[in-house]
Amino acid sequence: MKKFIIQGQVYTPGGVIADGVVVVENGRIAAVGPRAAVDVPPDARRLDAAGQRVIPGLIDLHIHGLLETSARSDVSGLAEALPRYAVTGFLPTLGSSSPQDTLQAVREIAAAITTKPRGARMLGLHLEGPYVSPRRPGAMEPFFVRPFSWEEFQALQEAAQGHIRLLTIAPEVPPARQYIPQLVAQGVIVAIGHSDATYEEAMEAIRLGVSHATHVFNATRPFHHREPGAVGAILLHPGVTAQVIGDGEHVHPAAIALLVRAKGAQGVALVSDAMPLAGLPPGEYVSRGKRLLSNGRAIRLPEGQLVGSATLLNGGLRTLVEQVGLSWTEALTIAAAVPARVLGLPTGRLEAGLDADLVILNDDYQPRLTMVQGEVVYQAA
């Protein structure tokens, strides 16, 4: 049984404990509190944060890749790399592709989930495409966008061994809407995204069971005061959790502030939507035959269209705190607690009884140490 005592500025849902400790035993948090008030096991290994922040591990519900590693080609490599960016859990995410390629990718990710590679935990799979609107494909290949097929999805879920946890759909494209209750009954979290839905269409989808929104504001019919669209429904309905990309370019910090004011921190989930170029130096790259430009924050085509983010969740956390102006408590709720709640997992907060997924973070938002279920999976040199 491994035991650890982590000392530092401990960030709990109730606030910051300036001289706090987290006791970890057998993969779970055994105790959290002021150092003077917590009984420390004498045989525990001490990990001193040297006054730096001890935060819950971040959870990314939407990531395609980083460091030239993609969810399609090497999801185990993705899991290994993410703890360097304060991420302890994630949903590898697939966009639109041919039925054969989608099936193969799903099968390979499911096999990796089963083997449980070292690093950040794969918490399931996010199928962002192909069941989206041809009017709002974003950076997806429009050729592969197609209407929802119950038969195809069941084959994909079987190949995934039941690991498809999150499914993005455009509910206004028939026949997607009619299958929402059945998907929810199977335990799938249904999200609206890449959608041209009107306000009424979006609200009807929410009534049927949609409870999540994929990268709100992006690749979705924009808000208009005479036709609020899906964005209006997402902002208004308390039962919908909204993903937001935190690179400061996909969504202006002021828009993120408005989103949090409308829904509260408990209604927002930070995501990266990071692409395989994330983590690489700014510059010009060629990926799958396309020229792409990265400024280190976001990735664009030469003509300026956004195709994905180059910012991981630790960078998104910086955006929430330094540009949006949120408190650390609010920012960590959005980056850790809400994603954990969406997935129904006992993590995302530094509380006794929860999984010991935590990070020692320096003032530059870089992890000094990342722990997943009580195992140190990354430690800075």
Predicted features and spans:
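Active-site metal-binding motif and surrounding structural segment of the metallo-beta-lactamase
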Residues: A37-V54, E158
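Active-site core of metal-dependent hydrolases
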Residues: Q154-L280
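His/Asp/Glu-enriched, well-ordered alpha-helical/loop segment
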Residues: G232-Q243, G248, V260-S272, L277-L361
